[in-house]
Amino acid sequence: MDFEGQKLAEYIYQYTIIIFGVIGWIIGFIKQDFSITFYSVALGTFLSLILCLPNWKIYCQHPLSWQKPIVQSTPTDKSK
C-alpha cells in the first residue's frame, strides 16, 4: 500500500463508519431502539474492515520510486 492508498483507505473507513453511524442514529431515534444504532455502527465497522484491511489493487496505484543509494568511499586513516 502506497501513501495515496493509505489516504484513500483512511477516507473510506472514516466516511463509512460516520455514514452508517448517522443513518443508524436517525433510524434508531425514529424507532426508539438503541440496538439499531449499535448494529448499524457495527455493520459499518465490519464493512470498513473488509474494504480497507486487505491490500487491494486500488491502494497500490502510485508505487514509490526509491532513489539509488549513494556509495561513499571509506575514509583512509593516514595517522598510523
UniProtKB/Swiss-Prot annotation:
Where does this one sit in the cell?
A: Endoplasmic reticulum membrane
How does the entry describe its membrane topology?
Multi-pass membrane protein
In Gene Ontology terms, what is a biological process of this protein?
A: signal peptide processing
Q: Which Pfam families match?
A: SPC12
Q: Which cellular components does GO assign to this protein? A: signal peptidase complex
Function (record text)? Component of the signal peptidase complex (SPC) which catalyzes the cleavage of N-terminal signal sequences from nascent proteins as they are translocated into the lumen of the endoplasmic reticulum. Dispensable for SPC enzymatic activity.
Protein name (record): Signal peptidase complex subunit 1
